[in-house]
């Protein structure tokens, strides 16, 4: 439980198993290579508050992080926004990432290969009225399976090569 440690965020939950193997941390050049990492059987809740202490940090974040293999199994994360304005939840059966590169100085983030299996995602704006059909304020996606290559987020734009995508939404929409 991080209550009181981060000015506008509380993170609590439990970690079943966490493993990180790294053979390359270069403090002088601000680079990290994570060879293998995994998170299993974990539950995390993130609560964002509407008031935060002013950030007085003067140094820039220059880190470049390379991730060879990252795996998440049987884990979930729930995020609640200030004033209960939005709720986001993800229950991951398995998520695997291969060859990720994250340049924090340039705000450039890439993943060569991502696979998601047997997962669920929920997006909810609790104060909005429910609508018939596909309701963008109350989404619940189940049976989510996806394979994506060449994911890139840079300059507020995202691109990806979607190899496969399967999902069901509670309104009856199915993508196969």
Task: Give names to the regions the model predicted.
Residues 1-176:
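N-terminal targeting/secretion presequences
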């Amino acid at each position: 439980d991080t209550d009181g440690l981060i000015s506008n965020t509380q993170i609590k939950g439990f970690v079943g198993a966490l493993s990180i193997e790294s053979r390359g941390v270069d403090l002088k050049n601000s680079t990290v290579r994570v060879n293998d990492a995994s998170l299993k059987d974990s539950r995390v809740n993130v609560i964002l508050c509407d008031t935060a202490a002013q950030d007085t940090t003067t140094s820039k974040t220059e880190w470049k992080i390379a991730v060879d293999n990252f795996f998440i199994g049987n884990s979930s994360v729930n995020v609640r926004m200030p004033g209960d304005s939005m709720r986001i939840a993800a229950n991951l059966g398995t998520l695997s990432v291969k060859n990720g590169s994250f340049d924090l100085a340039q705000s450039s983030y890439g993943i060569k290969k991502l696979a998601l299996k047997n997962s669920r995602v929920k997006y909810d704006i609790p104060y909005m009225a429910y609508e018939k059909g596909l309701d963008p304020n109350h989404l619940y996606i189940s049976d989510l399976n996806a394979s994506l290559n060449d994911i890139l987020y840079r300059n507020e734009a995202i691109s990806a090569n979607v190899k496969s995508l399967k999902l069901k939404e509670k309104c009856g929409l199915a993508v196969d």
